[in-house]
Structure formats: structure tokens, C-alpha cells
């Protein structure tokens, strides 16, 4: 007996996600019950559909969104290190489900077993505002036709079949794992993840979070706790100090308790500087903290630790100093602090940060050698590298590549043209000041280096990995091309040594750094000075990687499959930093710290625990906690979008937020959305 259209639908649900939100659906299908296999067993596939329900006209509302979804589905057994034998088990994913578009995937039932389990993720791709959301619906049916054209759906949402169970996990569920009742006595190792510019921790760093948790098996004597601060989302143009202070207060006031005995930091892009400021702030403002907690790992991935001045044209420095991307742009442009008279990144590279960094067990920087249009190699690696060896490894990789070249080889989603016209074109008018330039070379080098425009496009439309790359680990080329520990003695003593010696001025990887006239040379010397300060009295492990585009987001696997080229980088990070070699229950330093006499550090106010700040810190470190007056341009153009959006949201039933909720208007609400964009067109001119 055939199923009717109604009972062909096994599950139907509606939900929505805001910036930094994801929802996971764990789909369990019981093929049969009992020990005996039924004679009439059906092995027909199930079908999954995720539909973006926002109106079609919202595609133009890029500054209030963009209203897009990332979706993927895989079997529960899938792991990227294992070869996929059956092609039907190949993960399905779509990096950019636009409004009124569908993501449809087959859930293959091809073997006789009692239970099948799949995991589907739905992630928001909103970048700029906290007050808009993407509405979507999830449908599971017994045929492709039933999910593509559903009708006569039951009025209630949920599962309509006893064979199908779907568990929905929200962002909070995924980031707050259930407390293990068997480990209350264990010491905790807190791992803090920090996102970069126009990013968020809860979706963009969720892959790293889950991989770190998988390393828990290496730590029988302690419990790993991975957290990230969500309060800086859509605030990232307000400056390193503003963002770092908020992160530090979050660590102290919300995360710390007496069970936390170790701490590690992992920061991507701007997040590397933010976490560095937070560490310095905690060290001085809450001096008791690092007497109670042992610092273990300080890790950055593609972070502009020296700023981004010399790899850009001269006019970029002017734009940064004017605050085109807010206070953050001024920080990255090495603009002098008005009160102190020195750039924040210069101040940050000295005391007190260096003093506490020396106590970390490991300090590691990961840097992209190629295909990163946001953060150049020299600033992500703290400048001093064996560039000749890196160039040699790149040439070997090119010659020995099993597949196509390292650039322009990956498939690109078919809606690239529409996306470029409606999103990238206006966006780059505002953000193009972060565009490392391509300098001509005498020998016509073919070292690939994507532009900022390509990187901006790849945030939401990344060049997709090849099918073989995802299915077969043996098909993947090595990406770690340089992995070395640099001690202070390895650093050249003068600029002369840099230009003519080990670090080769003529190396094409450094041509952008050394190009330019006297004005550029001034900032080059400043960046070199900052780099030397980072190396004083300690060693750094520097890992240089060669990733395909978009390397800046691939290095953190921003989306599990769309940015899969970064899998080996995160594998390396876990293997090196979370391998269990620092797990022990008899750490002498830990025992000393746990019994060390510390001044009273907490008071109770209205039932909430608060930790006291130091009453006085040395005058030379006053820049850490000096209250600043924020100007309107400290937020930059896209930072202001969020602020304006919050104001609009507060005006009841007025403006854009009222339009998207209005159902019975006399006019088509889509027209009002378009008019809203037209009225605010000055934001994108």
C-alpha cells in the first residue's frame, strides 16, 4: 500500500537563527525492531530538505544580514580521517542557501541494520547585525518529491513516525555540554577561543571546539572546558582594547571558579591580539589569577600581530588612521594612542604581556604562506622566519602536487555572479582598506596570493573542496610546510642581517614588506621593533601552512565541509597542544599555586560573585585600564550598522524590524524592505 502525500512526511519543524547561531538535528531512523529481520523490509532512502523561508527580496538586504544559511548532513560515524567507501555516505553540504532556496539531501538506507543516525547542521551566515534572523523549516520524508512539494502537512510540528526520532540541539546546547557526574573532583583546563573581525565564536570556531573536546581522552586526570566570549559579536571594529577588556572580564567574572587550574588561549585573526590584550589586562588588574591558574597554550591562527601597514599602499595607512574600520583599523594601522603617544600594538608587545607569556608552556603561531588576502605571512609569523626554506617547500609542493595547483582550482558555487553583484561589490567599498596588494616581481613569480576581494567573497562563498579530498584522506596534499621553534638567539641582530642574511630581502615572500619609500620604511622599522619585542626572552613555535583559497577562513575550518582544506591544520593543533603530555594529577607547580596565600579576591553583591580589581597598577601600564571616550567613528561603517539596527529594533513596530514581522499589511512587505535599503543606500556607496 503506497503512502499518501501526508504520511510520506515523517518530520517537519520550523525555526530561526541569528548571527552566531546554529542548530543541530540528530536524526535517528529505526529500520526495524527486535532481533528478526522483517521479510518485507524496505531499504528506500529518506530525504531531508532545509528551506530558507525569508522573502526573496531579502537577498538585497545584505547589510541587515546577509539572510543566508550554511547546511550540511553526514552520517554519525563520519570522520574526516577515515576513507568513505560507499559514495552514498558522502557528506552533503551547501555553503550558501539563499532566501527561498532549498538544501535537499538523500539520507541513504543501503544496508540492513537496525538503526541509522545522521547529523544535520544549520548555521546562520548573518555577519553584521544582532537583531535580524533567518527563518527556515526542516522536512524529512520518504521520497524526494514529498519534501520538495509538501502539502497537507499536519498542524503540529515534530515527528510523525514512531520509526523516526529527531533531537534538536541549539547553540547553547552545543557549547554547554552536560556536566559529567563522574568527574566533579577533576581539575579543569579552561580553553578560551577568540574570533576575529566580523566573525563570531559560536559558529565560526565550533569545529575547533569540538575537536578539542575529542582530545579529552588524553586527559584522564583533568576535565577540558572550551568556552568563547559571544559578547563581542558585531562589535569588532571598536578596537583591541575594548574587545580585550570585555574578554578579560568575561573570563574572570563568568568563567573562573576554584576548580579551574589551567588555561589555554586560541585566537583567530584579530582574536590573537584580543586574547593577548586580555592576558595582559588580567595579569595586572587581577594579579591573583595567574597565581591560581597555570598558563599552558598561547596559540594564534593567521593573526596580524604586527599590524597590516607595510603590505598595503600608502593611502591605506591614511584611511586606517581616519578610522575607516573604526578603532580596530587605527590599531592595525599602528596609529599612535593620543594619551600615550605610542601604537597599542607596540605597547602590547612589551611588559606586562611578555612577562606572563614567558610562563606559558607553549607559544605557537600558525601563518598562511599563500592564499590569505587578509593577514600577510610576515605579520602572522612575527616576521622572523626562514623564508628561503618556506619558498623551497612551496616550490616542492607545487611540483609534487597530486592534483591541481594551489590556486584557482577549487569549484565555486554557481550563484557566484549574483552574490558578487548584490553583496561583495558594496561590501568591498567599505572594507577594501584591508587589501594586501600584489607587487610585481622581476622573475614573474607564480606564488599564489589572493586579493582581499577574493577573500571577502570566500567568507560566504568559499571555493569548495574536491569530492576526492573529502572522501579519501590519502588524496590530500600535505599543508604543513614549515614547523620550527625559534629562540631569541635565532633572531638577527640588525636590519642588515635581515636584508642580506638568513631572512633574505630578495625572497619574493618578503617583497611586499620591503617595497616602498621612506614613509613605508618608517612603519617597516616599527613592525620590526614590535616583532623583536615579542621574541624577548622566549621561544616561539612557528607553523607555516600552504592552504588553498580561502586560506584565512580555511585555517580555522570556519564551516566543516566548505572550509575542509583546513582540517590538517586543526589536526596538527590538537596533536601538538592537546596530546595529554601536560596531564597529571601531581603537578608540583599546581600544588604550590593551590595553596598559595592570596588576598581576598571576591565579594558578594546581590547574590552574584564578583572579583575585585587591583586598586593600583604601575603607571607605565595605565594604558591597560584607562577609560577612553569612544567616538562615533570608533565603530567603523559596519560597526555602526549593528548600532543602528539595535536602535531600529527598539522602536516598536517601526523601521525594518517591524516590517519583517508584519503579516497583514496592505502593501507587500517585500517592497518596504527594498525601500529600506534604498533609504540607507549611503551606507554602501
Curated annotation (Swiss-Prot):
Its EC number is 3.1.-.-. Keywords: Hydrolase, Lipid degradation, Lipid metabolism. The active site is at 269 (charge relay system). One of its GO terms (cellular component) is nucleus. GO terms for molecular function: monoacylglycerol lipase activity. Gene3D superfamilies: alpha/beta hydrolase. GO terms for biological process: lipid catabolic process; lipid metabolic process. InterPro entries: AB_hydrolase_fold (IPR029058), DUF676_lipase-like (IPR007751), Lipase-like (IPR044294), Rog1_fam (IPR016445). Belongs to the putative lipase ROG1 family. This is Putative lipase ROG1.
Amino acid at each position: 500500500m503506497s503512502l499518501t502525500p501526508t504520511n510520506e512526511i515523517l518530520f517537519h519543524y520550523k525555526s530561526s537563527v541569528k548571527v552566531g547561531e546554529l542548530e543541530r538535528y540528530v536524526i535517528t531512523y529505526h529500520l526495524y525492531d527486535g532481533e528478526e529481520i522483517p521479510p518485507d523490509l524496505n531499504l528506500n532512502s529518506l530525504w531531508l530538505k532545509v528551506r530558507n523561508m525569508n522573502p526573496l527580496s531579502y537577498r538585497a538586504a545584505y547589510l541587515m544580514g546577509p539572510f543566508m544559511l550554511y547546511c550540511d548532513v553526514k552520517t554519525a560515524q563520519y570522520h574526516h580521517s577515515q576513507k568513505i567507501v560507499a559514495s552514498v555516505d558522502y557528506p552533503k553540504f551547501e555553503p550558501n542557501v539563499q532566501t527561498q532556496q532549498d538544501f535537499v539531501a538523500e539520507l541513504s538506507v543501503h544496508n540492513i541494520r537496525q538503526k541509522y543516525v545522521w547529523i544535520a547542521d544549520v548555521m546562520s551566515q548573518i555577519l553584521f547585525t544582532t537583531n535580524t534572523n533567518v527563518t527556515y523549516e526542516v522536512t524529512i520524508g520518504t521520497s524526494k518529491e514529498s519534501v520538495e512539494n509538501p502539502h497537507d502537512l499536519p498542524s503540529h510540528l515534530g515527528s510523525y513516525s514512531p520509526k523516526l526520532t529527531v533531537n534538536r540541539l541549539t547553540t547553547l546546547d552545543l557549547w554547554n555540554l552536560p556536566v559529567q557526574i563522574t568527574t566533579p573532583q577533576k581539575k579543569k583546563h579552561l580553553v578560551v577561543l577568540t574570533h576575529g573581525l566580523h566573525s563570531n565564536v559560536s559558529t565560526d570556531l565550533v569545529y575547533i571546539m569540538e575537536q578539542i573536546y575529542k582530545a579529552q581522552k588524553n586527559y584522564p586526570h583533568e576535565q577540558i572546558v572550551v568556552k568563547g566570549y559571544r559578547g563581542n559579536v558585531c562589535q569588532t571594529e571598536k578596537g583591541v582594547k575594548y574587545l580585550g577588556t570585555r574578554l578579560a572580564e568575561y573570563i574572570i567574572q563568568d568563567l573562573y571558579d576554584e576548580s579551574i587550574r589551567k588555561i589555554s588561549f586560541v585566537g583567530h585573526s584579530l582574536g590573537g591580539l584580543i586574547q593577548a590584550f586580555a592576558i595582559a589586562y588580567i595579569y595586572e588588574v587581577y594579579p591573583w589569577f595567574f597565581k591560581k591558574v597555570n598558563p599552558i597554550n598561547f596559540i594564534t591562527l593567521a593573526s596580524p600581530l604586527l599590524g597590516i601597514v607595510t603590505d598595503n599602499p600608502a593611502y591605506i595607512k591614511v584611511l586606517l588612521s581616519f578610522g575607516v574600520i573604526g578603532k580596530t583599523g587605527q590599531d592595525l594601522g599602528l596609529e599612535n594612542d593620543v594619551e600615550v603617544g605610542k601604537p597599542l600594538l607596540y605597547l602590547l608587545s612589551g611588559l606586562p604581556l611578555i612577562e606572563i607569556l614567558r610562563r606559558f608552556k607553549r607559544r605557537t603561531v600558525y601563518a598562511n604562506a599563500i592564499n590569505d588576502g587578509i593577514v600577510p605571512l610576515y605579520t602572522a609569523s612575527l616576521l622572523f622566519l626562514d623564508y628561503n626554506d618556506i619558498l623551497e617547500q612551496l616550490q616542492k609542493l607545487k611540483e609534487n602536487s597530486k592534483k591541481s595547483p594551489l590556486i584557482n582550482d577549487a569549484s565555486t558555487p554557481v550563484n557566484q555572479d549574483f552574490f558578487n553583484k548584490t553583496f561583495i561589490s558594496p561590501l568591498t567599498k567599505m572594507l577594501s582598506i584591508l587589501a594586501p596588494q600584489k607587487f610585481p616581481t622581476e622573475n614573474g613569480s607564480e606564488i599564489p596570493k589572493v586579493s582581499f576581494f577574493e577573500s571577502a567573497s570566500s567568507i560566504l562563498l568559499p571555493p569548495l573542496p574536491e569530492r576526492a579530498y573529502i572522501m579519501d584522506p590519502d588524496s590530500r596534499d600535505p599543508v604543513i610546510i614549515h614547523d620550527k621553534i625559534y629562540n631569541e638567539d635565532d633572531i638577527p641582530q640588525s636590519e642588515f642581517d635581515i636584508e642580506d642574511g638568513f631572512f633574505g630581502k630578495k625572497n619574493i615572500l618578503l617583497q611586499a614588506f620591503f617595497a616602498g619609500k621612506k614613509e613605508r620604511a618608517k612603519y617597516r622599522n616599527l613592525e620590526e621593533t614590535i616583532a623583536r619585542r615579542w621574541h624577548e626572552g622566549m621561544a616561539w613555535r612557528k607553523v607555516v601552512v600552504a592552504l588553498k583559497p580561502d586560506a584565512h577562513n580555511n585555517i580555522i575550518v570556519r564551516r566543516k565541509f566548505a572550509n575542509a582544506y583546513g582540517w590538517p591544520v586543526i589536526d596538527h593543533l590538537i596533536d601538538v597542544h592537546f596530546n595529554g603530555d601536560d596531564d597529571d594529577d601531581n603537578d608540583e607547580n599546581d600544588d604550590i599555586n593551590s595553596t598559595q596565600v592570596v588576598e581576598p579576591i571576591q565579594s558578594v553583591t546581590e547574590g552574584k560573585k564578583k572579583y575585585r580589581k587591583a586598586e593600583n597598577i604601575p603607571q607605565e601600564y595605565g594604558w591597560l585600564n584607562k577609560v577612553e571616550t569612544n567616538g562615533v567613528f570608533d565603530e567603523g561603517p559596519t560597526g555602526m550598522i549593528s548600532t543602528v539596527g539595535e536602535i531600529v529594533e527598539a522602536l516598536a513596530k517601526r523601521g525594518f524590524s517591524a516590517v519583517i514581522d508584519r503579516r497583514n499589511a496592505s502593501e507587500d512587505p517585500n517592497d518596504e524592505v527594498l525601500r529600506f535599503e534604498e533609504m540607507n543606500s549611503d551606507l554602501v556607496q
